[in-house]
Amino acid sequence: MASVYIPVQNSEEEVRVVLDQLPRDASDILDILKAEQAPLDLWLIIAREYFKQGKIEQFRQILEEGSSSDIDEYYADVKYERIAILNALGAYYSYLGKTETKNREKEEQFISATRYYNKASRIDMHEPSTWVGKGQLLLAKGEIDNALQAFKIVLDTAPDNVPALLGQASVEFNRGRFSESLQLYKRALQVFPGCPAAVRLGIGLCRYKLGQLDKARQAFDRVLQLDPDNVEALVALGIMDLQANDSIGMRKGMDRMQQAFEIYPYCASALNYLANHFFFTGQHFLVEQLTETALAVTTHGPTKSHSFYNLARSYHSKGDFEKAGMYYMAAIKETNNNPHEFVFPYFGLGQVQLKLGELKGSVFNFEKVLEVYPDNCETLKALGHLYTQLGQNEKALEYMRKATKLDPRDAQAFVGLGELLISSDTGAALDAFKMARTLMKKGGQEVPIEVLNDIGALHFEREEFESALENFKEALGDGIWISFLDEKENLEQTGVSVLGYKDTGIFHRLIESGHSVDVPWNKVTTLFNLARLLEQIHKTEAATFMYRLILFKYPGYIDAYLRLAASAKAQNNLPLAIELVNEALKVDDKNPNALSLLGELELKNDDWVKAKETFRAANDATDGKDSYAILSLGNWNYFAAMRNEKRNPKLEATHLEKAKELYTKVLTQHNSNMYAANGSGIVLAEKGQFDIAKDVFTQVQEAASGSVFLQMPDVWVNLAHVYFAQGNFALTVKMYQNCLRKFFYNTDSQILLYLARTHYEAEQWQECKKTLLRAIHLTPSNYTFRFDLGAVMQKSSSSTLQKKKRTADEVRSTVAEAENAVRVFTQLSAASDLHVHGFDSKKIQTHVQYCSHLLEAAKVHREAAEQEELQNRQRLEVARQAALAEEARRKAEEQRKYQLEKRKQEEELRRLKQEEEKFQRIKEQWKSSTPGSNKRKDRVEDDDGESKPSERRRKKGGKRRKKDKSSRARHYEDDEEEAATMDDHNEVEDEDANTNYNREDEMTTQEAEEPVDDDAHDLLAAAGLEDPDVDDDEVPTSGVRRRRALSSSDEEGELMEESHPNSSPQKEKEESNGEAGDPNMEEEEEEEEAN
């Protein structure tokens, strides 16, 4: 049993104080310590013992008395003990300030601690323990940098000061510098291996933050070896076990948390983890107790944030969104609005705000979550839905598409994407829903009815009725509807019709026969869609049965009443349709759809006043926000303006202006409403503003063409009407024809009537008649078309007879048209129910008389036209015979010219062939001649004496050749004369040719008798000839050169007859050179070659 001894003053006796039996009133001990003037270290020992025993007041009383001014004055020379007492008080108040939850009290405690540390520094400003205390105080106040400076002051003078090392390690840990903190903890342990277990706790926390989980676990286990009741180590190991994500680890983790809670019930971390455990077990009352306790015992921001989060989650799961939101915001506040510290409260708050309709706040918080986890699919899906509700579809699609890319196996993400795409891209929406269905089936999940219904509805809107039917059947499963779909039940025998919609006997009979007529509430919509599909594919009886089945099980299902009313309207049973709509209004007398349909039926029933009141009621039921009701009122005003046959201009203008106002109101609310835009265009067209109306109709047409949900043939018809009013009949016809083909498969008689009117105005009578015949074929009971056909034939006949020039065929056609018109009008006049169709018998008789008159006139015109046609045929026959005779003469003349040309070509070819043969003979003769070298030399020597006479003879021979050439030219000019004369000329030419040939022979003989020297090749070259035996490369390569050689040979033959027989070859060479230099000679040669 530990004791301390207080020495008695002026005596050797001592007062023994047992530390375990300290008095409850510290005043007794203080009296002894003061009376005996006990050493200050005893004061400190006794005060510390009181603190250990939890007697904080006695501890504070003793230390405050030990730091009083009297004590300071009495123990002025005792520095260390006085400093120790002051530092103990500073540490105590630092602890109070750290644990205080109220800011004001916290600040007061820190001020007291600061005062004691400053007083200790005044005693000795270099005391390390004082700086360590100051560092701890600054660390508790959150002044990390100042705390670091305080610890450094100590470590600069005493590097191995363990408290300073531990303080600096704590600072580095709070600064996130876990490696540096770990080194400082290890250094402190090296300096003092026997330090408390808390040092190893710091090492474990550093290693945990650094991701060294195994070494961290070793450190925490060592702490528990040294201190089995260390709560922090138990909590740390419990967290690590829980993070293992397996059943064994989670069980061990919760056991450690429970153990820590039993050791110290005020450990906030243990309380939070226990609360989290009980949240998942559904024990919310324990969650609230534990988190409230944790909040009461901790001031640590992150720990309090976790406590608020647990409390918020508990209220959130119970549906108390107001409290949940409040605690989520408290959790966020404890993290200083930094989502990176603790992001879960942001996600929870976003969910709560979404439930409460605070969409923008929800978006803000989910965006904060994305800052920390940008690839979190749940957050992306939530933001996709939020932006959809805010009307920002582009952003919504962006987030949904990102979610599907990040997790292609998330079926719900594809469902959300499909819901977003329904209004903009049905194909992509259908693909998304199909992908979701595939993923669900692969995952073994049951595909929700809603998904199958959406897939079926999209197929239905795309007119893929078979696929829609399969999906609706899959969504509905087994039921009575299967029997009717497979035609196992005879609908006719069952007695299904719209008329008996109140008769429930059919269903009672089915129940009695063993059939189940149950319709689960979550299948009603799909069953309605199935009935709508059957109605679309003309299985009206089966659809009627489905609607009646829905009403049998759910009498308040208004849409079923409205579809039955639509069926009755299609059968032209307006009273039954009105009765069914009234039944729907009994369920909800302010249903805008029912009121709008009732107004339409009343309008069709020509009950204008009631229709207007009904449309107003539909508009009031939606506070003026229902576009259909406003459009119906606008249509009513338009029809009212057009209804009055007398056309009161003032009333008409009033109704049109009101209609325009209502259409504009709809466009203001929904600027993409094409029906309102179409109505505005109609009003503009009625006012004569055709260009503006045309622009409006064109824009509506383009918008409607880009939508698969919307079919608007009306806008095509209206646009055609505008073209018609502007007189552009070609475009009008094209628009009507396109509308017929695109929307009505060329079977709408009313549009055919519009088309016929256009042809009529364009005076295209035959096209008009064909169009009316098509309309009559489609609706043979419509006598209006027959009357119009008769009028068209009447007009066609009249216009043909009024022509100044017309053929007999046209007149005969006119007679046929007039006869048909008489027949049509006669048939109409014989009908007994003319008044039903709005015809006047007197007016029809007038048409009959007029057509009969046309017929008589047409017959007269026909006879005249036939006579004129006969005369024209006779004139044409005479002209044809004359033309044939002229053609025969022309062909004979062409044949004669052709024969002459052919004969001329043959003669030319024969002449060229003879010249070629002569050339070949001359070549052979020159080759066979043997030249003499001595005679050549003699010729060369005599060249100078014979040059001039030879030149004169050259000129004389040139004139003869010119004369011969002109003779030949005259020969070619006479080719146009008669055949007999041509024969005489040919004989003359043949004689001339023979004469020339004989002269050439004589020249050749004379030349052969003369000796030839070694320069014979040069002579050949001068005459235009070359010896092929001398040099093969010098053979002439063109026909022109050959012809020049022949010409030269002819001239030489003539010259040789006139010259002296002893003339030398040298003179002949000079003469040949003279010919080569004569330009007239060259021209004559060129003319001959051309001919």
Curated annotation (Swiss-Prot):
UniProt subunit comment: Component of the nuclear PAF1 complex (PAF1C), which consists of VIP2/ELF7/PAF1, VIP3/SKI8/WDR61, VIP4/LEO1, VIP5/RTF1, VIP6/ELF8/CTR9 and CDC73. Interacts with VIP3 and VIP4.
GO cellular component terms, semicolon-separated: Cdc73/Paf1 complex; nucleus
Compartments in which it is found: Nucleus
TPR repeat placement: 90-127, 128-161, 163-195, 197-230, 232-267, 305-338, 343-376, 377-410, 412-443, 449-482, 558-591, 593-625, 640-673, 674-707, 713-746, 749-782
Gene knockout outcome: Early flowering, reduced plant size and defects in floral morphology in whorls 1-3, but fully fertile flowers. Reduced seed dormancy and increased germination rate of freshly harvested seeds.
InterPro entries attached to this UniProt entry: Ctr9, TPR-like_helical_dom_sf, TPR_rpt
Keyword Transcription regulation: yes
Any GO BP: positive regulation of DNA-templated transcription
Organism: Arabidopsis thaliana (Mouse-ear cress)
Modification N-acetylalanine, positions: 2
GO molecular function: RNA polymerase II complex binding
Skewed-composition ranges (Basic residues): 951-965
Tissues expressing the protein: Expressed in roots, leaves and shoot apex.
PANTHER family, A to Z: RNA POLYMERASE-ASSOCIATED PROTEIN CTR9, RNA POLYMERASE-ASSOCIATED PROTEIN CTR9 HOMOLOG
Biased segments, Acidic residues type: 974-993, 1003-1016, 1026-1035, 1080-1091
Keywords attached to this entry: Acetylation, Flowering, Nucleus, Repeat, TPR repeat, Transcription, Transcription regulation
Job of this protein: Component of the PAF1 complex (PAF1C) which is involved in histone modifications such as methylation on histone H3 'Lys-4' (H3K4me3). Involved in regulation of flowering time. Required for the expression of the MADS box genes and flowering repressors FLC, AGL27/FLM and AGL31/MAF2. Required for histone H3 trimethylation on 'Lys-4' H3K4me3 at the FLC and AGL27/FLM loci. Involved in the control of seed dormancy and germination.
The keyword Hydrolase is assigned to this record: no
Region entry Disordered, spans: 919-1091
Name the UniProt record assigns to this protein: Protein CTR9 homolog
Pfam families reported in the protein's UniProt record: TPR_16, TPR_8
